Amino acid sequence: MRIKNGVWARKRHKKWLKLAKGYWGAKSRVFKQAHIAVMRSLRYAYIGRRLKKRDFRRLWITRINAAARQNGLSYSKFINGLKKAGISLNRKVLADMAINDQKAFAELVEIAKKQING
């Protein structure tokens, strides 16, 4: 008797079609197109997880730069002054301070200015 792969093939197809749920047109119903669409979306998701880190760092730097310039210092000089002062806060925390705690951020800018000017 010839053994076929019907049950397992159907399970495999259902798995991919389940991942393609919500896709438009045949991409959610036809296995071959659904499989291609899901593979592409997984690839974009993988790439996106790496781009997200870059995008957030860029956003934090932009926010820090804007807040530092309001207090009379450029971003690069501000970071240099903090390094010289021995203050090691990451950019995520600095950006949060720039938005939510402007007084504390202004104090950090003053500390950085003192370190730069000597």
UniProtKB/Swiss-Prot annotation:
Family annotation (InterPro entries): Ribosomal_bL20, RIBOSOMAL_L20_CS, Ribosomal_protein_bL20_C
Return the Gene3D superfamilies for the record.
Answer: 6.10.160.10, Ribosomal protein L20 (1.10.1900.20)
Recorded GO cellular component terms are:
ribonucleoprotein complex; ribosome
Print the keywords alphabetically. Ribonucleoprotein, Ribosomal protein, RNA-binding, rRNA-binding
**Keyword presence, Aminoacyl-tRNA synthetase:** no
| Family (UniProt) | Belongs to the bacterial ribosomal protein bL20 family.
NCBIfam families, per the entry: rplT_bact
Biological function: Binds directly to 23S ribosomal RNA and is necessary for the in vitro assembly process of the 50S ribosomal subunit. It is not involved in the protein synthesizing functions of that subunit.
The name on file for this protein is Large ribosomal subunit protein bL20
- Gene, per the UniProt record: rplT
